[in-house]
């Protein structure tokens, strides 16, 4: 397969995800397919965003890493010290992705590291490993292209996350501001009673303890549910199950006291 064909295959995958979050596992599998390598896509803090490995590489240590979806902190630090592409790293180098405890299996292995950059900052690392054969110039071109594309996707996801947080905060603020004094007091007591982000509420018990009517509690919950801040479900005589949908709600409620 030519370099152009390999690049097109990677582009085809990304076009499928246009407008939605990219599954980095799919990206890793595509990179693995077109480069015939083992692949790790790692965040700057060492989280494994995506990977594609052959069975030979799956030692006990690697399996544990995959289960935890995190690489060891010392290896993360070493990766972050790599400022530009480093190619054809052998098994005896501390940057090898292959398990040194199985050195005899990977004596001819080669690791290549591509820093993932975007928006002027380091976002992570693309690590490719081959059991045999050096990485050639075409491999390096494709790897650097893949790292650039991954960087753009990570940035897009970060921006989407920031936008979502801003929307959530606005919705939470509007919901809290829509509550009357007594409704807000009722909500504060409800979540003190729950002691967390979800649980079972018996409205009459809270109403009696706080000295407000049950209808105040019902109205307050309805306003929050309409704003998409919480969800509630009646369990009949057992009470009402309540769950917070927007994770910053309790923090904002505390700030508003």
UniProtKB/Swiss-Prot annotation:
<dbReference type="Pfam" id="PF08222">
    <property type="entry name" value="HTH_CodY"/>
</dbReference>
<dbReference type="GO" id="GO:0003700">
    <property type="term" value="F:DNA-binding transcription factor activity"/>
</dbReference>
<dbReference type="GO" id="GO:0045892">
    <property type="term" value="P:negative regulation of DNA-templated transcription"/>
</dbReference>
<keyword id="KW-0678">Repressor</keyword>
<dbReference type="GO" id="GO:0003677">
    <property type="term" value="F:DNA binding"/>
</dbReference>
<comment type="similarity">
    <text>Belongs to the CodY family.</text>
</comment>
<protein>
    <recommendedName>
        <fullName>Global transcriptional regulator CodY</fullName>
    </recommendedName>
</protein>
<comment type="function">
    <text>DNA-binding global transcriptional regulator which is involved in the adaptive response to starvation and acts by directly or indirectly controlling the expression of numerous genes in response to nutrient availability. During rapid exponential growth, CodY is highly active and represses genes whose products allow adaptation to nutrient depletion.</text>
</comment>
<dbReference type="Pfam" id="PF06018">
    <property type="entry name" value="CodY"/>
</dbReference>
<feature type="binding site">
    <location>
        <position position="98"/>
    </location>
    <ligand>
        <name>L-isoleucine</name>
    </ligand>
</feature>
<keyword id="KW-0238">DNA-binding</keyword>
<feature type="binding site">
    <location>
        <position position="43"/>
    </location>
    <ligand>
        <name>GTP</name>
    </ligand>
</feature>
<keyword id="KW-0805">Transcription regulation</keyword>
<feature type="DNA-binding region" description="H-T-H motif">
    <location>
        <begin position="203"/>
        <end position="222"/>
    </location>
</feature>
<keyword id="KW-0547">Nucleotide-binding</keyword>
<keyword id="KW-0804">Transcription</keyword>
<dbReference type="InterPro" id="IPR014154">
    <property type="entry name" value="CodY"/>
</dbReference>
<feature type="binding site">
    <location>
        <position position="47"/>
    </location>
    <ligand>
        <name>GTP</name>
    </ligand>
</feature>
<feature type="binding site">
    <location>
        <position position="24"/>
    </location>
    <ligand>
        <name>GTP</name>
    </ligand>
</feature>
<feature type="binding site">
    <location>
        <position position="22"/>
    </location>
    <ligand>
        <name>GTP</name>
    </ligand>
</feature>
<keyword id="KW-0963">Cytoplasm</keyword>
<dbReference type="GO" id="GO:0005737">
    <property type="term" value="C:cytoplasm"/>
</dbReference>
<dbReference type="InterPro" id="IPR036388">
    <property type="entry name" value="WH-like_DNA-bd_sf"/>
</dbReference>
<dbReference type="InterPro" id="IPR029016">
    <property type="entry name" value="GAF-like_dom_sf"/>
</dbReference>
<keyword id="KW-0342">GTP-binding</keyword>
<dbReference type="InterPro" id="IPR010312">
    <property type="entry name" value="Transc_reg_CodY_N"/>
</dbReference>
<feature type="binding site">
    <location>
        <position position="45"/>
    </location>
    <ligand>
        <name>GTP</name>
    </ligand>
</feature>
<dbReference type="GO" id="GO:0005525">
    <property type="term" value="F:GTP binding"/>
</dbReference>
<feature type="binding site">
    <location>
        <position position="44"/>
    </location>
    <ligand>
        <name>GTP</name>
    </ligand>
</feature>
<feature type="binding site">
    <location>
        <position position="158"/>
    </location>
    <ligand>
        <name>GTP</name>
    </ligand>
</feature>
<feature type="binding site">
    <location>
        <position position="96"/>
    </location>
    <ligand>
        <name>L-isoleucine</name>
    </ligand>
</feature>
<comment type="subunit">
    <text>Homodimer. Homotetramer. May form homodimers under conditions in which energy sources are sufficient (active state) and homotetramers under insufficient nutrient conditions (inactive state).</text>
</comment>
<feature type="binding site">
    <location>
        <position position="153"/>
    </location>
    <ligand>
        <name>GTP</name>
    </ligand>
</feature>
<dbReference type="InterPro" id="IPR013198">
    <property type="entry name" value="GTP_trans_reg_CodY_C"/>
</dbReference>
<feature type="region of interest" description="GAF domain">
    <location>
        <begin position="1"/>
        <end position="155"/>
    </location>
</feature>
<feature type="binding site">
    <location>
        <position position="61"/>
    </location>
    <ligand>
        <name>L-isoleucine</name>
    </ligand>
</feature>
<dbReference type="InterPro" id="IPR036390">
    <property type="entry name" value="WH_DNA-bd_sf"/>
</dbReference>
